[in-house]
């Protein structure tokens, strides 16, 4: 039962991170198209946001392994 829960948790976290990354990158590209002179600052902010979004699936996999081993 724990393995099923761990798989579902990791899968949903990966889907959520994929959607979040798509939204962040899409809006960053929209901003770069509107204001090309701000592209450097927008790119840096985008990488920070993508890094924070990617922390969610990593943490969920760690928690899933902890739940699976109990």
From Swiss-Prot:
Sorted UniProt keywords: ATP synthesis, Cell membrane, CF(0), Hydrogen ion transport, Ion transport, Lipid-binding, Membrane, Transmembrane, Transmembrane helix, Transport
GO function terms (MF aspect): lipid binding; proton-transporting ATP synthase activity, rotational mechanism
GO cellular-component term (any): proton-transporting ATP synthase complex
SUPFAM superfamilies referenced in this protein's UniProt entry, alphabetically: F1F0 ATP synthase subunit C
Membrane topology designation: Multi-pass membrane protein
UniProt site (Reversibly protonated during proton transport): 54
Pfam families hit by this protein: ATP-synt_C
Compartment(s): Cell membrane
Segments traversing the membrane: 4-24, 47-67
InterPro entries according to UniProt: ATP_synth_csu_bac/chlpt (IPR005953), ATP_synth_F0_csu (IPR000454), ATP_synth_F0_csu_DDCD_BS (IPR020537), ATP_synth_F0_csu_sf (IPR038662), ATPase_proteolipid_c-like_dom (IPR002379), F/V-ATP_Csub_sf (IPR035921)
CDD domains: ATP-synt_Fo_c_ATPE
Function: F(1)F(0) ATP synthase produces ATP from ADP in the presence of a proton or sodium gradient. F-type ATPases consist of two structural domains, F(1) containing the extramembraneous catalytic core and F(0) containing the membrane proton channel, linked together by a central stalk and a peripheral stalk. During catalysis, ATP synthesis in the catalytic domain of F(1) is coupled via a rotary mechanism of the central stalk subunits to proton translocation. Key component of the F(0) channel; it plays a direct role in translocation across the membrane. A homomeric c-ring of between 10-14 subunits forms the central stalk rotor element with the F(1) delta and epsilon subunits.
UniProt record similarity statement: Belongs to the ATPase C chain family.
Subunit structure of this chain's protein: F-type ATPases have 2 components, F(1) - the catalytic core - and F(0) - the membrane proton channel. F(1) has five subunits: alpha(3), beta(3), gamma(1), delta(1), epsilon(1). F(0) has three main subunits: a(1), b(2) and c(10-14). The alpha and beta chains form an alternating ring which encloses part of the gamma chain. F(1) is attached to F(0) by a central stalk formed by the gamma and epsilon chains, while a peripheral stalk is formed by the delta and b chains.
Name of the protein: ATP synthase subunit c
Taxonomic path: Bacteria, Bacillati, Bacillota, Bacilli, Lactobacillales
Gene field: atpE
